[in-house]
Amino acid sequence: VTDATPTAGPEEAVRVLRDDHERLLTVVGQCATAVTAEWDGDSVTDRERVVPPFRRALDGSGALSRLPRALADAVTATGRPMAAPPVAAPPYVVVTGEGVVLRANLGDGRLVVLLRAFEVDRGGDGDGDSDGDGGDGGDSEPHRYRRIDGVEIEAEIV
């Protein structure tokens, strides 16, 4: 018999978010949809038309302040300790052009969860080799942001 707490993988974090925070995920999706209602078409190339309004919508809906609790529950589901209680600000909760990134330092790594609400077409020549530093592709296509259907959850422990 051992006193060690069993640990689970990131799939348990995803399960807890889906099962226990379904309403929060719905609100995140509604906020993303509200952002796209201000666009002229189904996509935009200006990150400023995605991230700041998405953050304002999340804050105004109360979702932003509820995300740290969801992150804490996701960490608990992995069976790992969290270094500090999360707050609704970086580095724990970050609103990006793809959605919301939740991060928590664990005893043996970091849990990173993406609540993806947008896809980002990074433009360029499509060969997938770009590292995003500009390189020699001075006139590459701008990033294009599109709303995806629903909110996808991706999680990993790194």
Regions found by a protein language model. Give the residues of each.
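Acidic, polar-rich N-terminal leader regions of halophilic archaeal proteins
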Residues: 1-158
